[in-house]
């Protein structure tokens, strides 16, 4: 049996590592990424435009690209359809973009075809597979759905890691929507997402809608949300939100008003009803104020110099708020 390799924490901390590399800065990392969206939402337009710009080292949404050759397996299209798309895109057709409309499947010739292409075109650093489903094969009866999806992506990840390249898989979404987590809409098992290095999910509220929301996440990619608009066959960036931006939007306006309320006094104590009345808030807020204060105690109140605690008496539960510009979130305790 092959011995397990380990490294102790002290050695690991001292060892220098090369930072993660990106083909498109902050967008497409080395490894396997998923681009998922509903059918006919413009995914193929997006990846063809990206491929043409990456070949020429042109920026994508203001992000720096690393120029390289690209292999685009457009397995649901024809060469004539691809030609028509390129005519309609504003960029020149680069010679470094190699197009293919028929290829083998995983464990049935695809790996060897990629190896052959890489030998002939070693400057290739991006392979786009459109769509992922077209290269998948059935697994044996002993392989579960999760394991099968994980294995398929892992096979491609090994190729990406061996060559130090990026592979972008175009994939579909389930018809059933999940507004709480758009990544749950990715077609197939969670094993597909679990094995990927990054994932992008395009969501449209209505098919006729001209914009899409793109949700991004990854191992070396911080969560972001983009709003894109298709204009003259090109997806343009309208809005970009980081995780911090999204978190800030979740802060209820009531808390900002509370900060102003406490600027006029060093401390305050009383019931939720009394707080709402003194602040002039809507009466319905009294049913939510305790939950809001508890949820945002460490993430908002303490960074704004407000210490919060509660005390239960025989008559009622009292809320205690005190200004303390030196307060540390590690010291914040709620007395119940």
Give a label for each model feature:
Residues 2-5, 10, 17-19, 23-24, ...:
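Conserved inter-motif catalytic segment of the P-loop NTP-binding fold
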Residues 19, 34-36, 40, 44-45, ...:
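Phosphate-binding/switch region of NTP-binding enzymes
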Residues 29-33, 68:
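Pre-Walker A (Motif I) flank of P-loop NTPase domains
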Residues 46, 50:
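Hydrophobic positions on the alpha1 helix immediately C-terminal to the Walker A/P-loop
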Residues 53-67:
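Post-Walker A helix-loop "phosphate-sensing" segment adjacent to the P-loop in P-loop NTPases
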Residues 87-96, 189-193, 300-301:
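Short, conserved catalytic or adaptor-binding loops enriched in Gly and charged residues
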Residues 228-336:
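DNA transaction DNA-binding modules
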């Amino acid at each position: 049996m092959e011995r397990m390799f380990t490294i102790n924490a002290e050695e690991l901390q001292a060892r220098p590592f090369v930072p993660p590399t990106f083909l498109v800065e902050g967008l497409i990392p080395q490894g396997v990424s998923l681009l998922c969206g509903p059918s006919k939402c413009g995914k193929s337009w997006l990846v063809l435009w990206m491929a043409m710009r990456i070949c020429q080292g042109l920026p994508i949404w203001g992000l720096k690209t690393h120029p390289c050759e690209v292999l685009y397996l457009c397995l649901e299209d024809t060469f004539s359809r691809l030609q028509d798309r390129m005519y309609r895109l504003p960029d020149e057709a680069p010679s470094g973009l190699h197009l293919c409309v028929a290829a083998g499947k995983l464990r049935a010739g695809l790996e060897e075809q990629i190896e052959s292409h890489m030998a002939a075109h070693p400057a290739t650093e991006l392979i786009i597979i459109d769509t992922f489903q077209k290269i998948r094969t059935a697994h044996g009866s002993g392989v579960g759905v999760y394991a099968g999806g994980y294995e398929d992506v892992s096979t491609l990840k090994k190729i990406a890691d061996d060559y130090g390249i990026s592979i972008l898989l175009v994939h579909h979404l389930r018809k059933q929507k999940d507004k709480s987590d758009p990544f749950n809409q990715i077609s197939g098992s969670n094993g597909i997402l679990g094995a990927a290095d990054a994932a992008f999910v395009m969501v449209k509220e209505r098919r006729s809608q001209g914009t899409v929301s793109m949700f991004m996440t990854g191992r070396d990619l911080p969560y972001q949300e983009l709003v894109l608009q298709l204009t003259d066959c090109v997806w343009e960036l309208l809005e970009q939100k980081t995780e911090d931006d999204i978190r800030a939007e979740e802060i209820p306006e009531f808390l900002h008003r509370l900060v102003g309320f406490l600027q006029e006094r060093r401390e305050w104590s009383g019931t939720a009803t009394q707080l709402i009345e003194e602040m002039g808030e809507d009466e319905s807020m009294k049913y939510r104020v305790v939950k809001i204060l508890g949820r945002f105690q460490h993430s908002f109140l303490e960074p704004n110099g407000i210490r919060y605690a509660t005390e239960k008496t025989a008559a009622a539960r009292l809320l205690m708020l005190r200004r303390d510009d030196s307060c540390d979130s590690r010291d914040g305790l709620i007395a119940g």
